[in-house]
Amino acid sequence: MESTKKQVSLELLPWLVVHTDGTVERLAGTEVCPPGLDPITGVFSKDIIIEPKTGLSARIYRPFSIQPGQKIPLMLYFHGGAFLISSTSFPSYHTSLNKIVNQANVIAVSVNYRLAPEHPLPTAYEDSWTALKNIQAINEPWINDYADLDSLFLVGDSAGANISHHLAFRAKQSDQTLKIKGIGMIHPYFWGTQPIGAEIKDEARKQMVDGWWEFVCPSEKGSDDPWINPFADGSPDLGGLGCERVMITVAEKDILNERGKMYYERLVKSEWKGKVEIMETKEKDHVFHIFEPDCDEAMEMVRCLALFINQVEA
């Protein structure tokens, strides 16, 4: 009797496997939870459609404490997952957004961009750009009634931080009347062919991350593609970053740690006229705040992000 078990064509661990018939089986980030009232923070959320043609959706959040007529900052959030996994309804992200919205007192729009390999890059960037440029046109009451569009922030973790970086450039170069107040980049997913920092000693992990990127964005440039390496040939000069303020957070044990620090250093030395700050969390690894939301370090990071958005010195 012939086995009905699917044969594996490609393993991209720990995220997914691709079977010989072309189907993609994700191994992480597939759990979902509904929107609604969060009993712990009092934050309300609901799912909305941004672009009916593509099915692009988002989960929007508003704090409990908001008053009629009150205007508060608007935060577009982009989740991580190496452009391969996760969603706005992934329980850990939903919990994280509830905490950020409660602490920072913002209207948040968590963008559910489409994932590779079914939707190869630059689809994630295009979806995120669609969400940003159409944020007013969708005619969402929570945005119309409560969001201060002059206080617009782009925030993301890992791949989502990478997206925030690119959107800040695109918004400045476009003819859209978009003014981004600041971007928050949590453990940004930047990479490069030449290893630096911990990448030099941890060859196995370096090769693994190389493989992730080559899978979602196959090109002759590899990890020196401007999408992933902001300092590679063809990347826009950081002096042209289209926002007033930047906050970068890195984690000591994260393989991406040195990339985030390098971004900070290069931005400081550039012609950019804004204000940048960096925060390093000791003894923690990549996106720890998503998987340990109640640890002291995660709560401190959320507190500092809230201060950044509300222009208060930590």
From Swiss-Prot:
Record-annotated active site: 158, 254, 286
Keyword annotations: Hydrolase, Serine esterase
Stretch forming the signal peptide: none
UniProt motif (Involved in the stabilization of the negatively charged intermediate by the formation of the oxyanion hole) ranges: 79-81
Any GO molecular function: carboxylesterase activity
Family matches, as SUPFAM superfamilies: alpha/beta-Hydrolases (SSF53474)
Domain of life, per lineage: Eukaryota
Reactions catalysed: a carboxylic ester + H2O = an alcohol + a carboxylate + H(+)
Enzyme Commission identifier(s): 3.1.1.1
Expression sites (tissue/organ): Expressed in roots and flowers.
Top EC class for this record: hydrolase
PANTHER family (UniProt xref): ARYLACETAMIDE DEACETYLASE, CARBOXYLESTERASE 2-RELATED
Homology family: Belongs to the 'GDXG' lipolytic enzyme family.
Function summary: Carboxylesterase acting on esters with varying acyl chain length.
Name of the molecule in the record: Probable carboxylesterase 2
Gene: CXE2
